[in-house]
Design a protein with these regions (language model features):
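Conserved donor NDP-sugar-binding/catalytic core segment of glycosyltransferases
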Residues: 108-135
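A conserved acidic beta->alpha catalytic loop
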Residues: 41-51, 103
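Short beta-strand-to-loop acidic/aromatic patch adjacent to the donor-nucleotide binding site
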Residues: 91-104
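Short, flexible, basic/aromatic active-site loop/helix in glycosyltransferases
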Residues: 123-124, 136-155, 227
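Glycine-rich, basic loop-to-helix element that forms the pyrophosphate-binding segment
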Residues: 71-90
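Acidic helix N-cap motif at the loop->helix transition within catalytic regions
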Residues: 13-16, 47-56, 108
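Acidic donor-binding loop at a coil-to-helix junction in glycosyltransferase catalytic cores
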Residues: 180-186
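Short, well-formed alpha-helical segments that are part of the catalytic scaffolds
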Residues: 11-28
Length: 234
C-alpha cells in the first residue's frame, strides 16, 4: 500500500482541487491497482474543511483509493505531517508521499516518485497563478523563473512534493513537531542515516502563491519576503 498525507488548517476552498488531483494520481494505471490511502490531518480547522472531506468521501468511490482524516489542535505543520504519517504507517504502507492542501499534483506524481527507486524523493514546485499578489505578480513571476532551479539535481525541499520510503522514515525518526521547516529537518535526518536521494523535477506539483500562508516561515512567507524586498528597493 501507498500513503499520502496532507496537513490542513482552514483549507475548505483548496481541498476540492487538491483531492481531485490526488485521486487521479492514485488511480494511475501504472500503479496496477495498488491501494492508496489518502489521509488529511485537520489541524485546528474552524471552517468547513471536514464537511468537504465528508462530501468527497460520499461522492467519490474507488476500489483502490481510500480517503480518511483525523483532527489535531497543534497549529504546527510538523505535528500534522507526523500524525498523518504515523496513522498510515500503522496501516503498513510501504511509501509515504506528502503534499499540501493548496497544491495539485500531476497525474503521474506517485508513479514518478516510485519510478526513481530511491528512499527519498525531493521534488520541485511550480506556481501557475501569481494574481493574489496583484501589482507584484509580474515581478514575482519573473523572479521565480529566473532564480528557481526547476531541474533534476536541484536542492529544494518542499513538504508539498516529498516522498519517503516507510522504512527510511521510521529509521530517521519522522517529522518533528515544529511550526515550520519540518521538511528540512526530516531531510537532514534522512541524510544522516544514509538514505538514497533523488532531487528530481519529474514528479510535478502546482502550488499556490496565496498571501495568507498557513505555515509561518514556509513557501508563502518566502514569496512575501521577496515582495517586501522589492518594495523596499523602490
Amino acid at each position: 500500500m501507498l500513503g499520502i498525507v496532507i496537513p490542513a488548517h482552514n483549507e475548505e476552498a483548496c481541498l476540492p482541487g487538491c483531492l481531485a488531483a490526488l485521486y487521479v494520481a492514485a488511480s494511475h494505471p501504472a500503479l496496477r491497482g495498488e491501494t492508496v490511502l489518502i489521509h488529511v490531518v485537520l489541524d485546528h480547522c474552524e471552517d468547513g474543511s471536514e464537511d468537504v472531506l465528508k462530501r468527497w468521501q460520499q461522492r467519490r468511490q474507488s476500489a483502490c483509493v481510500a480517503l480518511s482524516w483525523s483532527q489535531i489542535d497543534k497549529r504546527k505543520v510538523g505535528a500534522a505531517r507526523a500524525s498523518g504519517a504515523n496513522r498510515l504507517l500503522a496501516r503498513d504502507v510501504r511509501w509515504l508521499a506528502f503534499t499540501d492542501a493548496d497544491t495539485q499534483v500531476s497525474p503521474e506524481w506517485l508513479v514518478q516518485q516510485l519510478a526513481l527507486e530511491v528512499d527519498v524523493v525531493c521534488g520541485s514546485v511550480a506556481v501557475d497563478d501569481w494574481s493574489p499578489h496583484a501589482g507584484q505578480a509580474a515581478m514575482l513571476r519573473t523572479h521565480f523563473s529566473q532564480t528557481y532551479n526547476d531541474r533534476d539535481g536541484h536542492r529544494h525541499i518542499h513538504g508539498a512534493n516529498l516522498g519517503v520510503a516507510a522504512d527510511a522514515y521510521r529509521k530517521a525518526g519522522g517529522f518533528q513537531s515544529v511550526p515550520c521547516h519540518e521538511d528540512v529537518y526530516l531531510v537532514a535526518a534522512l541524510e544522516r542515516i544514509g538514505a538514497r536521494f533523488a532531487w528530481s523535477a519529474a514528479p510535478r506539483v502546482v502550488t499556490s502563491a496565496r498571501t495568507d500562508a498557513r505555515a509561518r516561515g514556509g513557501f508563502g512567507d518566502t514569496i512575501l519576503a521577496v515582495v517586501a524586498a522589492a518594495t523596499a528597493a523602490l
